[in-house]
Amino acid sequence: MIENGSIIELSNEKKYMITDSSIEDGIIYYLSLVVDKISEIPTEESVFFKQIDQNTLVPITNPDDIDFLKTIFVNKFLQHYMNEIEQ
Protein backbone atom coordinates (compact mmCIF):
# COMPACT_ATOMS: atom_id res chain seq x y z
CA MET A 1 0.00 0.00 0.00
CA ILE A 2 1.34 3.42 -0.97
CA GLU A 3 0.74 6.02 1.71
CA ASN A 4 -0.29 9.62 1.23
CA GLY A 5 2.68 11.90 1.02
CA SER A 6 4.92 9.28 -0.56
CA ILE A 7 7.64 9.93 -3.11
CA ILE A 8 8.62 6.89 -5.12
CA GLU A 9 11.46 6.81 -7.62
CA LEU A 10 10.30 4.79 -10.63
CA SER A 11 12.96 2.26 -11.55
CA ASN A 12 14.54 2.46 -14.99
CA GLU A 13 12.76 5.74 -15.65
CA LYS A 14 13.68 9.33 -15.02
CA LYS A 15 10.48 9.93 -13.08
CA TYR A 16 9.07 10.17 -9.58
CA MET A 17 5.57 9.24 -8.49
CA ILE A 18 4.09 11.44 -5.79
CA THR A 19 0.97 10.25 -3.98
CA ASP A 20 -1.12 12.59 -1.89
CA SER A 21 -4.60 13.94 -1.32
CA SER A 22 -6.25 17.32 -1.01
CA ILE A 23 -9.65 18.71 -0.09
CA GLU A 24 -10.97 21.22 -2.63
CA ASP A 25 -14.49 22.67 -2.31
CA GLY A 26 -15.37 19.98 0.24
CA ILE A 27 -14.38 17.09 -2.05
CA ILE A 28 -11.42 14.83 -1.25
CA TYR A 29 -9.16 14.27 -4.25
CA TYR A 30 -6.37 11.71 -4.44
CA LEU A 31 -3.52 11.81 -6.87
CA SER A 32 -0.77 9.72 -8.22
CA LEU A 33 1.33 12.40 -9.88
CA VAL A 34 4.10 11.12 -12.14
CA VAL A 35 6.74 13.83 -12.52
CA ASP A 36 9.65 13.97 -14.94
CA LYS A 37 12.89 14.33 -12.91
CA ILE A 38 14.50 16.75 -15.33
CA SER A 39 11.65 19.08 -16.28
CA GLU A 40 9.74 18.60 -12.98
CA ILE A 41 6.52 18.61 -15.03
CA PRO A 42 3.67 16.12 -14.40
CA THR A 43 3.32 13.56 -17.17
CA GLU A 44 0.24 12.13 -18.84
CA GLU A 45 0.68 9.06 -16.60
CA SER A 46 -0.65 11.06 -13.65
CA VAL A 47 -3.97 9.81 -12.27
CA PHE A 48 -6.59 11.63 -10.21
CA PHE A 49 -9.53 10.30 -8.21
CA LYS A 50 -12.29 11.87 -6.17
CA GLN A 51 -13.89 10.29 -3.15
CA ILE A 52 -17.68 10.04 -3.47
CA ASP A 53 -18.32 8.18 -0.21
CA GLN A 54 -16.31 6.54 2.55
CA ASN A 55 -15.35 3.50 0.47
CA THR A 56 -15.55 4.69 -3.14
CA LEU A 57 -13.03 6.51 -5.32
CA VAL A 58 -13.94 7.51 -8.86
CA PRO A 59 -11.28 8.20 -11.51
CA ILE A 60 -11.42 11.66 -13.03
CA THR A 61 -11.40 11.48 -16.82
CA ASN A 62 -12.63 14.89 -17.97
CA PRO A 63 -9.56 16.68 -19.47
CA ASP A 64 -10.65 20.07 -18.08
CA ASP A 65 -10.99 18.62 -14.57
CA ILE A 66 -7.60 16.92 -14.90
CA ASP A 67 -5.94 20.17 -16.00
CA PHE A 68 -7.58 22.01 -13.07
CA LEU A 69 -6.41 19.38 -10.58
CA LYS A 70 -2.90 19.26 -12.03
CA THR A 71 -2.69 23.01 -11.46
CA ILE A 72 -3.89 22.71 -7.87
CA PHE A 73 -1.61 19.82 -7.03
CA VAL A 74 1.40 21.27 -8.79
CA ASN A 75 0.99 24.58 -6.99
CA LYS A 76 0.26 22.94 -3.65
CA PHE A 77 2.63 19.99 -3.56
CA LEU A 78 5.21 19.84 -6.30
CA GLN A 79 7.63 22.46 -5.00
CA HIS A 80 7.45 20.94 -1.51
CA TYR A 81 8.23 17.48 -2.84
CA MET A 82 10.96 18.62 -5.20
CA ASN A 83 12.66 20.39 -2.28
CA GLU A 84 12.36 17.18 -0.24
CA ILE A 85 13.85 15.11 -3.09
CA GLU A 86 16.82 17.47 -3.49
CA GLN A 87 17.77 17.20 0.21
Regions found by a protein language model. Give the residues of each.
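Short beta-strand or tight-loop elements
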Residues: 14
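Basic, polyanion-binding surface patches
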Residues: 3, 19-60
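Acidic, low-complexity intrinsically disordered segments
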Residues: 54-85
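Short coil-to-beta transition motif at edge beta-strands of beta-rich domains
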Residues: 1-8
